[in-house]
Amino acid sequence: MIELQNVYAWGIDGKDAGQFRNVFTDDVDAQYTTLMRMQGREQLSLWLETFHAPYDGTQHLFTNFAFTSDDDGVLMRSYVVANLFVHAYPGGENFVSHGYYLDRVVQAEDGWRVRSRQIINLWREGNVGLLDVGQQAVQNSR
């Protein structure tokens, strides 16, 4: 199951949508902020690809994995540090978000997949204006 986070991070940071989209079930339910919730692998994958595309670099680091099994699969909790970078961006080139992911992981025909995801942001540092770069890309794609 840890491999799911690794594949997700390498796919996002390598701008490889084909890689990270396979981490999720078809009916994934994902809440990336308190204001944004996406349902379905296609909607989530498109948003992730579009949001991260304009950055000169991103790096997602996962640690401190914890697992709890129940009848609905496995609850996987992991710390995340997500870095966004845009060269020569006004106000600062870097933004870093610290928090954790709460993932409901289920066994699918082709291996473990994330069925639900909630991101809990604990604190942020750097130029929060860099989030506008990804959000503007999403707005422009509509």
Where are the language model's segments positioned?
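Aromatic-acidic/polar surface patches that form glycan- and anion
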Residues: 1, 13, 37, 56, ...
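Short, low-complexity N-terminal intrinsically disordered segments enriched in polar/charged residues
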Residues: 1-10, 14, 18, 22, ...
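Short, charged/polar micro-motifs that form catalytic or ligand-binding hotspots
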Residues: 10, 34, 91
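Short, flexible micro-motifs
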Residues: 14, 43, 102
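A solvent-exposed, acidic/Ser-Thr-rich amphipathic alpha-helical stretch
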Residues: 17-82
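A beta-strand edge to alpha-helix "cap/lid" segment located at domain peripheries
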Residues: 53-142
